[in-house]
Regions:
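Conserved, mostly hydrophobic/aromatic
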Residues: 18, 47, 83, 110, ...
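N-terminal pre-domain/capping segments
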Residues: 1-26, 31-38
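Glycine/small-residue-rich loop that forms an oxyanion/phosphate-binding "nest" at active or ligand-binding sites
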Residues: 40-107
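Active-site beta-loop-alpha junctions enriched in small/polar residues
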Residues: 8-12, 31, 58-64, 96-98, ...
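Glycine-enriched alpha-helix->loop->beta-strand junction motifs that scaffold or abut catalytic
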Residues: 20-26, 50-54, 87-90, 115-120
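Hydrophobic faces of well-ordered beta-strands that scaffold small-molecule active sites
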Residues: 3-7, 26-28, 55-59, 91-93, ...
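Catalytic cores of alpha/beta
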Residues: 10-21, 65-82, 128-138
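Hydrophobic, well-structured mid-protein blocks that either form specific transmembrane helices
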Residues: 87-138
Length: 138
């Protein structure tokens, strides 16, 4: 039985170490000390150039929670489009409302964009901050 090994990488160098260590795929971020934020397109491009495993990229403009303004969401949406065009195999994200429920509107819009590009949409640790109800699982 094969277990998929995914490594959270905070840099291009981290990704190369994961690749040499035979990881199956990575979640690429930046600034892990802040819980991870969106890496640069240059970082994604280099990782895709120098490895051949799937690279799922975090979309998060800042630390300090997962509740975003409309302007922040618009930037995240456009950044997602850009990262998909630069080879991201999946997008890792999470949108919450002020009451810690999942922001269905933002989530649906980003999932639609990612799936329209035939890539994987992945909810990150924002899920761990949700209200403890089964609706979050849907």
């Amino acid at each position: 039985m094969h277990c998929t090994v995914e490594i959270c990488c905070g840099s291009y160098e981290d990704a190369l170490v994961a690749y040499k260590g035979n990881a199956d795929r990575i979640e690429l971020t930046a600034a892990l000390y802040m819980g991870g934020v969106t890496p640069s397109t240059a970082c994604v491009t280099l990782v895709k150039r120098d490895t051949d495993f799937p690279v799922c990229v975090m979309i998060r403009p800042r630390g300090a929670g997962f509740c975003y303004s409309h302007a922040e969401f618009e930037c995240m949406y456009e950044e997602t489009r850009d990262l998909l065009n630069h080879g991201a195999d999946g997008i890792v994200f999470g949108f919450l409302n002020p009451d810690f429920s999942i922001n269905d509107e933002y989530t649906a819009k980003l999932v639609e964009l990612v799936h329209a590009n035939h890539k994987e949409a992945i909810m990150h640790r924002a899920f761990d901050c949700t209200s403890a109800d089964t609706r979050a699982l849907e």
